[in-house]
Amino acid sequence: MSVIVDIRGREVLDSRGNPTVEAEVVLESGVVATALVPSGASTGETEAVELRDGDKNRFKGKGVLKAVDNINTKIADLLIGENALDQVRIDRLMLELDGTENKSNLGANAILAVSLAVARAAAMELDIPLYRYLGGTNAKVLPVPLMNVINGGAHADNNLDFQEFMIVPVFGGRFKEALRCGVEIFHTLKTVLKDKGYSTNVGDEGGFAPALNSTKEALDILMDAIKKAGYEPGEDVLLAIDAASTEFYDKERKVYRFEGEELTADDMIVLYEEIEGTYPIISIEDGLAEDDIEGWKKLTKALGDKIQLVGDDLFTTNPKLIKKGIEEGIANSVLVKLNQIGSLTETLDAIELAKVASYTNVISHRSGETEDTFIADLAVATNAGQIKTGSASRTDRIAKYNQLLRIEEELGEDAVFKGKEAYSKFIR
C-alpha cells in the first residue's frame, strides 16, 4: 500500500512572490502528501543548482516550469511503482538519474520537493508524525530558536553589513516559554525602534530593517529591548550574528569591506573578540568568507572554544565539504539548509557527520520561504537543538514555530528543551 502511484509537480509562489516548486506524491493506499521548497537570497558558491527557466517574459526569468516538467516526466517515470518507505533508495535513484554533482540536470528544487513529499507520504502511510518517522523513538528535543529580529546585508536596504542580528531565548525550560520570551522581546524592540524614530517595516524573514549605522548600535538596541521586555541578557536571552561575510569580502584583494573600512581576516577576528567580550554573543555564522580558509582556521583557534562558529556558505550542507572542514579544524557548527544540498538523505548524512565530529547543527529556513513546516519536524527528528526560522512575524516563519508548539504538546512530558544547556560546550 506504500507504493507510489502518482507524482505531480506544480509551480507555486514563495514568501517573496517568486516561483518555487511544489511536489505531490500519491500512494496506492490513497495517501496524498505535498512538499514545497524554499529559496535563498545570499547563496554559497557550492550550493546545489536551483533550476530556473530563464525566460525573461515570465516572472523575470525566475519561473520553474522546467523543474516542474522534470517532476511530471522524468522523476515520475522513475519513481512510480517504488516503495515510499525506502527513502534512501528513492533519493539515490533521483541522484543517479540527475547524474551531476550539483543537481543541475533535474534541478535541486525538483529533486528536493519530491524527496520531502515522499517522506511525508511515508509518515502518513504509517500514521505517525513526520518527526517520529524521520527520527525514531528518541526524537524529542525541541530546538532553541535563533530569531532574526534585526536585518542587514543582503536582507535589507540599510547600512548594516552583517546580515542578521538574532536573539536566542533560552528562558523557561520549555520551547513555548522560550518562544514567548522571544516574541515579547520582538514586540518590545518595535517600540524601542519607534521611540528612536526608526522604521519598523519588516524584511524577508520578518525582522526589522531600520536605518542603523553600525553593528554596535544594533547590538545596543537589542540589549535595551531585552531588558525592557523584562529579561536578563546573558541569562534568559543570548545573542547571535549571521555576518554573511562572503557578501562583503573582496576575493581579489583578500579584504573585508566592513563599515567603511578595509579589514583583514585578523582585523575581523579582533572585531569578533571585542563583540564577544562586550555582549552575550553565543553564535557567529559565516564570520569569514567561504574562500578564506586560512582566516577560518585562525578564527576557530581564537574563538572556537568560547562560542559557536557556524558554517553556512562555508559548508552548504554538503557532506563532502563538512568532512573537509572537520579535517581542517574549521568552524564547530553546521547550518543545515535542505535546499543547499537538495535531498533529504544527503541532509541527514550531513547532520550525522557533524554530530559524530561533535559539531553542533542549526536547522535553517531560507529568506524565500513557504508555508511548508518540514524543517520544524526535521529539527526535532534529529535532536539538533537549534533552529533558525526567522522573526516573530510573517506567516511563513510563524508556521514553523506553530508546528514546534504542536510537537511539544504532542510529546508531553517526553519533550526536552535544553535552553542554555544547548550551548554547554561553550558556556563555562
UniProtKB/Swiss-Prot annotation:
| Compartments in which it is found | Cytoplasm; Secreted; Cell surface
Write down the SUPFAM superfamilies for this protein, in alphabetical order: Enolase C-terminal domain-like (SSF51604), Enolase N-terminal domain-like (SSF54826)
Q: Which domain of life is it from?
A: Bacteria
Residue numbers annotated as active site: E205, K337
Enumerate the Gene Ontology biological process terms: glycolytic process
Q: What is its main location?
A: cytoplasm
Q: Which residues span the membrane?
A: none
The Swiss-Prot or TrEMBL record lists the needed cofactor(s) as: Mg(2+)
For this chain's record, the cofactor binding note is: Binds a second Mg(2+) ion via substrate during catalysis.
Q: Which InterPro entries match?
A: Enolase (IPR000941), Enolase-like_C_sf (IPR036849), Enolase-like_N (IPR029017), Enolase_C (IPR020810), Enolase_CS (IPR020809), Enolase_N (IPR020811)
Record-annotated residues binding (2R)-2-phosphoglycerate? Q163, K337, R366, S367, K388
Provide the E.C. number(s) assigned to this enzyme: 4.2.1.11
Q: Which family does it belong to?
A: Belongs to the enolase family.
> What HAMAP family does the record tag this protein with?
Enolase (MF_00318)
Q: What does this protein do?
A: Catalyzes the reversible conversion of 2-phosphoglycerate (2-PG) into phosphoenolpyruvate (PEP). It is essential for the degradation of carbohydrates via glycolysis.
Q: What is this protein called?
A: Enolase
Organism equals Persephonella marina (strain DSM 14350 / EX-H1)
